[in-house]
Structures are given as structure tokens and as C-alpha cells.
Design a protein with these regions (language model features):
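Residues in the helix-turn-helix
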Residues: 26, 37, 66
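DNA major-groove recognition helix of helix-turn-helix/homeodomain DNA-binding modules
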Residues: 51-66
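Residues within the alpha-helical elements of helix-turn-helix
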Residues: 19, 30, 59
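Helix-turn-helix DNA-binding elements, focusing on the entry/boundary residues of the two helices
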Residues: 24, 35, 50-53
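Recognition helix of helix-turn-helix/homeodomain-like DNA-binding domains
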Residues: 33-48
């Protein structure tokens, strides 16, 4: 089984949503995506496209850099 640590996360979507008291369900509705898609992004199983990251940043009123983990290799 592969062990995943916090530094392997490519995005900070889970953190930013929590900071804003927003849910994955709410974001899914805003983006017209399924809750499953958002869940996979939040858990860093899949990643949103660059265009989707910019859409998310706009919806959450944050700089797109806020959504990215600067510790990625």
C-alpha cells in the first residue's frame, strides 16, 4: 500500500474550502461538476485542469497560487 503524506498533495483545495466553510457539494454545484469529481480533487486522487483551477480560484475569490501546494517536486 502506498503511503501518502501531506507533501505529496498537489493542490490545497481541501484546506481552502475548509477555511471558507464551503463544502465539496457547494463547489460541485458552482462548477457544474459531480460531487465525486470534486471529492477526487480534494483527496488529490485526480487534479483539476489549469482552466478549472482558475475557475475555482474565481469562485472562491482567491489567487490561483493559493490552491497550489508549493512543496510539490
Amino acid at each position: 500500500m502506498q503511503q501518502i503524506d501531506e507533501h505529496s498533495n498537489k493542490n490545497r483545495l481541501k484546506v481552502v474550502l475548509a477555511e471558507q466553510n464551503k463544502s465539496g457539494k457547494w463547489l460541485a454545484l458552482q462548477l457544474g461538476k459531480t460531487e465525486n469529481t470534486i471529492s477526487r480533487w480534494v483527496r488529490n486522487i485526480n487534479q483539476p485542469t489549469v482552466e478549472q483551477l482558475f475557475d475555482i480560484a474565481k469562485i472562491l475569490n482567491v489567487d490561483v497560487k493559493t490552491l497550489l501546494n508549493s512543496n510539490c517536486d
